[in-house]
Amino acid sequence: MGLMNAFDSQTEDSSPAIGRNLRSRPLARKKLSEMVEEELEQMIRRREFGEGEQLPSERELMAFFNVGRPSVREALAALKRKGLVQINNGERARVSRPSADTIIGEFSGMAKDFLSHPGGIAHFEQLRLFFESSLVRYAAEHATDEQIDLLAKALEINSQSLDNNAAFIRSDVDFHRVLAEIPGNPIFMAIHVALLDWLIAARPTVADQALHEHNNVSYQQHIAIVDAIRRHDPDEADRALQSHLNSVSATWHAFGQTTNKKK
């Protein structure tokens, strides 16, 4: 017996009840800008406008859709957020291809809001741990000599920045970025950059002196990660990475507790 359509189980007696429910919940009307946005998006996806091609002018779009300038501008702004068009001052919108950065950027506001909730930072730190664990195992198994050299160079810059907290944070981010680049997947890179940006932005402000010891510990842990990758030992690389990120998490949690007590 085939699957029954959901409507087949409804009896005639239920029609008045359905009607009452529909009348009590009127359908929301779409804004004109949303309708223009959807139509333009479909035209772009159907290749009616190719990548790099300019869309019609605002005036032409207003006439074509029979809407005002605000609706056209709102629609174009929405398409820009989706990465489907680029808009430069004084020029018509130009069709573009969404990048991994654009896709991740759409979640940025929600991510920052989630981080501000209780437990939010811990959840994102766990996500980072799971994600970088896979990256470091891949690096230990597949990294080329050239890629390992890039890790070693990032490690050297790390060592030169130990007494300068701002520089060390940059070198720390760059070290992990090199790890994320090894698979050659742009989506991995976008996720990794966003994760670190979100987590770093959520960290408390800490006095420079308090960070110096943390910098040295992180640097030594980076050495252990690179050594394991150089030996092509994924298990040891994973252990070193997990030890490092758990240490970072515990340190910043302690900094946060201290900061809260002072308030």
Swiss-Prot record:
Domain HTH gntR-type: 30-98
Source species of the chain: Shigella sonnei (strain Ss046)
Keyword Thylakoid found: no
Source superkingdom: Bacteria
PANTHER family listed in its UniProt record: HTH-TYPE TRANSCRIPTIONAL REPRESSOR NANR, TRANSCRIPTIONAL REGULATOR, GNTR FAMILY
Assigned keywords, A-Z: DNA-binding, Repressor, Transcription, Transcription regulation
Gene3D superfamilies associated with the record: GntR ligand-binding domain-like (1.20.120.530), Winged helix-like DNA-binding domain superfamily/Winged helix DNA-binding domain (1.10.10.10)
Function statement: Transcriptional repressor that controls expression of the genes required for the catabolism of sialic acids.
UniProt-listed SMART domains: FCD, HTH_GNTR
Residue stretches spanning the membrane: none
Region annotation Disordered: where it falls in the sequence: 1-22
GO biological process: negative regulation of DNA-templated transcription
Annotated signal peptide: none
NCBIfam families tied to this protein: PRK03837.1
Positions of the DNA-binding region: 58-77
Full protein name: HTH-type transcriptional repressor NanR
PROSITE patterns membership: HTH_GNTR
Pfam families: FCD, GntR
Record family assignment: Belongs to the NanR family.
Recorded GO MF terms: DNA binding; DNA-binding transcription factor activity
